[in-house]
């Protein structure tokens, strides 16, 4: 496993630009990302790089923000990053590596514009899109806040998520793409 980030950090092995990866052709078995795709300024270049660097059968696995009625309200009213489902293209406005974002971009690419993604990436197959985490992310405090519930409440939250709120209220999706 090789860890990378867009800027130097302690404990991270490499600094990488997702649109110009330094890995050789077909050298990666997987690219695993959490909350990254919606920050990449040109995802079409990134998909070309993923296609180039993944070995046949290699996987691109992402956990990304996802659009549901619930998440749209949360992202638009309680989150600091833009969440614009109506943009026409996939490119982000110019900005810093963390400041430029559209939380709706994964949904736009893999749901709204799925046909475009498939046509533009014939050797990348969408394997799974699994909406998840309608409540646990918020209850945990997300990335930068404290948990609002005690740890013993987690099993009840997970029960509600699995059996009642699963896809309708998801905040994120697990997206798996395979290089053919």
What residue spans do the PLM features occupy?
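Conserved class I S-adenosyl-L-methionine
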Residues: 59-93
């Amino acid at each position: 496993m090789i860890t990378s980030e867009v800027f130097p950090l302690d404990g991270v092995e490499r600094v990488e630009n997702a649109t110009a990866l330094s890995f050789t052709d077909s050298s990666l078995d997987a690219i695993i990302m959490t909350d990254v795709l919606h920050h990449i300024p040109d995802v079409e270049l990134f998909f070309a790089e993923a296609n180039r660097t993944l070995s046949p059968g290699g996987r691109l696995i992402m956990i990304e923000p996802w659009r549901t009625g619930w998440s749209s309200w949360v992202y638009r009213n309680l989150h600091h990053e833009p969440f614009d489902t109506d943009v026409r293209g996939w490119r982000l406005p110019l900005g810093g590596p963390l400041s430029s974002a559209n939380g709706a971009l994964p949904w736009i690419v893999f749901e709204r514009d799925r046909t475009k993604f498939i046509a533009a990436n014939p050797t990348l197959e969408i394997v799974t899109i699994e909406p998840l985490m309608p409540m646990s992310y918020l209850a945990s405090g997300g990335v930068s806040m404290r948990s609002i519930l005690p740890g013993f409440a987690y099993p009840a939250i997970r029960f509600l998520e699995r059996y009642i709120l699963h896809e309708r209220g998801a905040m994120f999706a697990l997206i798996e793409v395979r290089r053919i």
